[in-house]
A protein has these predicted regions:
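Cofactor-pocket helix-loop regions in the catalytic cores of large enzyme subunits
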Residues: 1-27
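Thiamine diphosphate
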Residues: 2-5, 13, 32-118
Length: 118
C-alpha cells in the first residue's frame, strides 16, 4: 500500500482521534483531509524536529488517556530518536498508535540512504 493510500485510510477511520504527522507524511495528510491545514481539528504537524513525533504523541496519549492518539511517521525520522521506542514500550499506552512508513531514505534532508534499509 502506498503512503497516500494508507493515510487516506487513516483519515477515513480517524473519528475523533488526535493525529500527529511529521516531515514527509505532512504533505500526504494535508492532501487527503478536506479542511485547510490550520483548521484540521485535533491535528498537529511536527516540522523541523525529525524524530520528535513519537515522543510528542506519547506525551499526549499519557495526558489524554480517554483519547486515541495516532502518529504518522517515517523510518528516517524515527531513526533520529530511536530510543523513544523503549520509552513508548515501557509506558505501553493502549490509546497510542504509531504508523511508520518505510522508504529507506532521509527524504526530508535530501534522500540520503538509511544505513540499514529494509
Amino acid at each position: 500500500m502506498r503512503r497516500r493510500e494508507a493515510i487516506a485510510a487513516l483519515v477515513a477511520e480517524r473519528g475523533d482521534a488526535i493525529t500527529i504527522t511529521t516531515e514527509q507524511a505532512i504533505g500526504a495528510w494535508r492532501a487527503t483531509v478536506p479542511e485547510p491545514p490550520n483548521q484540521i481539528p485535533d491535528h498537529l504537524d511536527i516540522v523541523g524536529c525529525m524524530g520528535s513525533a513519537s515522543t510528542i504523541g506519547l506525551g499526549i496519549a499519557l495526558a489524554k488517556p480517554e483519547r486515541t492518539v495516532i502518529v504518522v511517521d517515517g523510518d528516517g525520522s524515527l531513526l533520529m530518536q530511536l530510543g523513544s521506542l523503549v520509552t513508548i514500550a515501557g509506558a505501553a499506552p493502549a490509546n497510542f498508535f504509531h504508523f511508520v512508513f518505510e522508504n529507506g531514505v532521509y527524504e526530508t534532508s535530501g534522500s540520503q540512504p538509511l544505513p540499514a534499509e529494509g
